[in-house]
Amino acid sequence: MLLRDLVLRRGCCWSSLLLHCALHPLWGFVQVTHGEPQKSCSKVTDSCRHVCQCRPPPPLPPPPPPPPPPRLLSAPAPNSTSCPTEESWWSGLVIIIAVCCASLVFLTVLVIICYKAIKRKPLRKDENGTSVAEYPMSASQSNKGVDVNNAVV
């Protein structure tokens, strides 16, 4: 609020504001370091004795008691001396085998796709500059002669 009033009344007072912000912490530091450390109450004047009283700080209050343990909503299980049942290791083995089989199938399909892509014949350039794949049907169709209806007279 005070800052807004200063800016509105004086227009642009950034230099004085920056000077104030820079010197304010320095002035506080000077005020704090101006006093001398006090060793005991025997060398204290009456004016200082009134301010500091030379008493030790009061003891800290005792810590609060720990919170009670949480209550269980369900009935507690009866204490049994029998050992807990061990989990079967077959389920983990089945999962590992299933993941390995799925990975093997995926890699096999990937190898087949790559093999077919590499084995495919490369494209050749046609007379008009377009790329045409060399498949048996396209090669036989491109070797046909000029049609009689398209002959130029």
From Swiss-Prot:
Induction: By RAF1. Residues 56-70 form the PRAD domain. Residues 59-71 have a biased composition (Pro residues). It comes from the Eukaryota. Residues 114-153 are cytoplasmic. Residues 59-79 are annotated as: Disordered. It is a single-pass type I membrane protein. It is found in: Cell membrane; Cell junction; Synapse. InterPro entries: PRIMA1. Keywords: Cell junction, Cell membrane, Disulfide bond, Glycoprotein, Membrane, Neurotransmitter degradation, Signal, Synapse, Transmembrane, Transmembrane helix. Residues 36-92 are extracellular. Glycans are attached at N79. Residues 1-35 form the signal peptide. GO terms for cellular component: anchoring junction; plasma membrane; synapse. The chain crosses the membrane at residues 93-113. Pfam families: PRIMA1. Required to anchor acetylcholinesterase (ACHE) to the basal lamina of the neuromuscular junction and to the membrane of neuronal synapses in brain. Also able to organize ACHE into tetramers. The proline-rich attachment domain (PRAD) binds the AChE catalytic subunits. Interacts with ACHE, probably through disulfide bonds. This is Proline-rich membrane anchor 1. It comes from Homo sapiens (Human).
